[in-house]
Amino acid sequence: MSGRINVVQGDITLIDVDVIVNAANPSLMGGGGVDGAIHRAAGPALLAACRQVRQQQGECQPGHAVITEAGDLAAKAVVHTVGPVWRGGQDNEPQLLADAYRNSLQLVAANGYNSVAFPAISTGIYGYPKAAAAQIAFETVSDYLTRHPQPKQVYFVCYDEENFLLYQRLLGQYDEQPGA
């Protein structure tokens, strides 16, 4: 698994990958934070694609994911996943967050893409504690990659320094594990 997981700091809309994961809200219609940034960078085609998905499937529930075209982004597709709102950890939040990562990876693999970039899902307005969210992200992604050949590369793209340092530390721990 070493070499398949990467941690970078920056703007997820500028990362050179096949698929960008959007930490979406259930409506899929854009919002604040990374969701708004992705929608602004992708232009009206992304909103139209999300509107079509919503008309066909309704809102996207926490832990679920859908895939659309990428609009004006350099990526080939966008996976929209809804993470849980943090309510103290007693409302199935850890499982829902893991599901958001796992279901996103399954969509990337099922569509034959080789690389994907994830933001720190649920750690903005949804209030998930950053360290706990990073641990779940790493555990879920690394477990998935040990069982599946696709995607070949996963990037955790951290907008802020706090998340970047958390993810860098976890990457170091995972790289040190036997068999990693």
Curated annotation (Swiss-Prot):
It catalyses: 3''-O-acetyl-ADP-D-ribose + H2O = ADP-D-ribose + acetate + H(+); 2''-O-acetyl-ADP-D-ribose + H2O = ADP-D-ribose + acetate + H(+). It is an enzyme of class 3 (hydrolase). The keyword Acetylation does not apply. CDD domains: Macro_OAADPr_deacetylase. The keyword Phosphoprotein does not apply. InterPro entries: Macro_dom, Macro_dom-like, O-Ac-ADP-ribose_deAcase. Its EC number is 3.1.1.106. GO terms for molecular function: O-acetyl-ADP-ribose deacetylase activity; purine nucleoside binding; ribonuclease inhibitor activity. Keywords: Hydrolase. Residues 1-175 form the Macro domain. One of its GO terms (biological process) is purine nucleoside metabolic process. The active site is at D35 (proton acceptor). Substrate binds at D11, I12, N25, G33, V34, D35, S122, T123, G124, I125, Y126. Deacetylates O-acetyl-ADP ribose to yield ADP-ribose and free acetate. Down-regulates ribonuclease 3 (RNase III) activity. Acts by interacting directly with the region of the ribonuclease that is required for dimerization/activation. Belongs to the MacroD-type family. YmdB subfamily. Homodimer. Interacts with RNase III. This is O-acetyl-ADP-ribose deacetylase. It comes from Cronobacter sakazakii (strain ATCC BAA-894). The gene is ymdB.
